Amino acid sequence: MRSEGQKQSRKHEDRLAKKLGGKRTAASGAFWNRKGDVRTTDWLVEHKWTGKASFSIKASILEKIINEAILDSRMPVLGVSLNNQNYCIVLEDDLIEMRETIRELKETL
């Protein structure tokens, strides 16, 4: 039987996958060839949920998703559902690349 935290985490993974146009990874990335919790064509998302007001982000969590995303030719994203608010954490270089892409697209319109 799943705990309340597991149920909430799966609910948020499903929500994020739908919003990003991706799919939730079976077994939350436990298989060697399908890492991350949510996969899109561009992003590999590791998702963390807590009903608490704080959450510690350890370097090991970030390093894990970065390494898995690089091996999968995707951008790493850490999705966090914290105290009823949702956040996505990306590498600074990826954020700058996304901003430049948006600028270029706007110029073509």
Sequence positions of predicted segments:
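Catalytic phosphate/metal-binding cores of nucleic-acid and nucleotide-processing enzymes, i.e., regions
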Residues: 1-109
